[in-house]
Swiss-Prot record:
Belongs to the universal ribosomal protein uL10 family. One of its GO terms (cellular component) is cytosolic large ribosomal subunit. Pfam families: Ribosomal_L10, RL10P_insert. The lineage of its organism: Archaea, Methanobacteriati, Methanobacteriota, Archaeoglobi, Archaeoglobales. Part of the 50S ribosomal subunit. Forms part of the ribosomal stalk which helps the ribosome interact with GTP-bound translation factors. Forms a heptameric L10(L12)2(L12)2(L12)2 complex, where L10 forms an elongated spine to which the L12 dimers bind in a sequential fashion. The keyword Ribosomal protein applies. It comes from Archaeoglobus fulgidus (strain ATCC 49558 / DSM 4304 / JCM 9628 / NBRC 100126 / VC-16). Residues 310-331 have a biased composition (Acidic residues). This is Large ribosomal subunit protein uL10. NCBIfam families: PRK04019.1-5 (NF003098).
């Protein structure tokens, strides 16, 4: 006789219903891996997410049943099941939620026989390890070490393990001695579903500072283009009015248009041009008033610029002081020599 499968246990039915409620109640759903995350860190993450997002550790089989029951775009998340997973649901922007999840990661040491996800480089320089038997542990890890000025130093920058390699126990122990924590442990986003669109870590991991700089640069370029093409907007109206006033003022002054707002500037410009022309004429062509004005300008210029003699006089006392100091040092040296 063929075996007849009975109804699933009640606790599994309730678990699937709870997962369905979580997923369908929020616009953003994330599947994350929590492999190697300590229980204490997981509790801290729950506390930090409280009021911002809901997190729940789930079994792959139960999550798959919930997704099948919901159907539609939720089925896209089935491609990211596997491993030790949890679901996070939130009203938050997916990029901001991704940043929140990434911020849960903390530096962690590599464990013996673990596959390293990164290249681990120990830089040249002093270490916190005192001379003694611990030096041998560093040498067993392949580090060129020596004692200099009472300290153990690494003589050359060394890659002790490459990405994809198994971490030897000697290397793990040496890195722990050096307090090197090359990896970060925390929740790893596998995928997010936002309004029917799947977002992967490659899409979500954006450099917010660079994006902000790009927006600022684009805004400045757009503002410059709008101002130079006289395109009136809320942002450019004030700048364009100020520019128009300046251009009109300059035109009126240079064209000699007698308007109340520029009369004083026109007279000042004409006066300056008159004095410039007068300075090119011989004295006999000038009246006493012009001669007086030109001489006043010359005297003011002379007072503003110190003469060569004055500069030399200012430098002499400094040179004399330096010579006196040298003589005093020489006398002191002779005194020390002859007791």
């Amino acid at each position: 006789m063929a075996a007849v499968r009975g109804s699933p246990p009640e606790y599994k039915v309730r678990a699937v219903e709870e997962i369905k409620r979580m997923i369908s109640s929020k616009p953003v759903v994330a599947i994350v891996s929590f492999r190697n995350v300590p229980a204490g860190q997981m509790q801290k993450i729950r506390r930090e997410f409280r009021g911002k997002a809901e997190i729940k550790v789930v079994k792959n089989t139960l999550l798959e049943r919930a997704l099948d029951a919901l159907g539609g775009d939720y089925l896209k998340l089935k491609d990211y099941l596997g491993d030790q997973i949890a679901i996070i649901t939130a009203d938050e922007n997916p990029f901001r939620l991704f940043r929140m999840i990434e911020d849960t990661k903390v530096p962690s040491p590599l464990k013996p026989n673990q596959v390293s996800p990164v290249d681990v480089v120990v830089n040249e320089g002093p270490t916190p390890i005192p001379p003694g038997p611990l030096m041998a542990e560093l040498q067993m890890a392949g580090l060129p070490v020596a004692i200099e000025k009472g300290k153990v130093v690494v003589k050359a920058t060394t890659t002790v393990v490459k990405a994809g390699e198994v971490v030897r126990p000697e290397v793990a122990r040496a890195l722990e001695r050096l307090d090197i924590k090359p990896i970060k442990i925390g929740l790893d986003v596998k995928a997010m579903l936002d309004s029917g669109v799947i977002l992967t870590p490659e899409t979500l991991a954006i450099d917010t500072e660079k994006v902000l700089e790009d927006f600022q640069r684009a805004y400045q370029m757009a503002l410059n283009l709008a101002v130079n093409s006289a395109y009136v907007t809320e942002e450019t109206a004030e700048i364009l009015i100020m520019k128009a006033v300046m251009d009109a003022r300059n035109l009126a002054i240079n064209a000699g248009i007698f308007e109340k707002g520029v009369m004083e500037d026109i007279l000042m410009k004409a006066h300056a041009e008159m004095l410039s022309l007068a300075s090119l004429l011989p004295d006999e062509a000038l009246d006493e008033e012009l001669k007086s004005m030109l001489s006043g300008i010359a005297e003011a210029a002379a007072q503003a610029t110190p003469s060569v003699e004055e500069r030399e006089e200012e430098e002499k006392p400094e040179e004399e002081e330096e010579e006196e100091e040298k003589e005093e040092e020489a006398i002191e040296g002779l005194g020390a020599l002859f007791g």
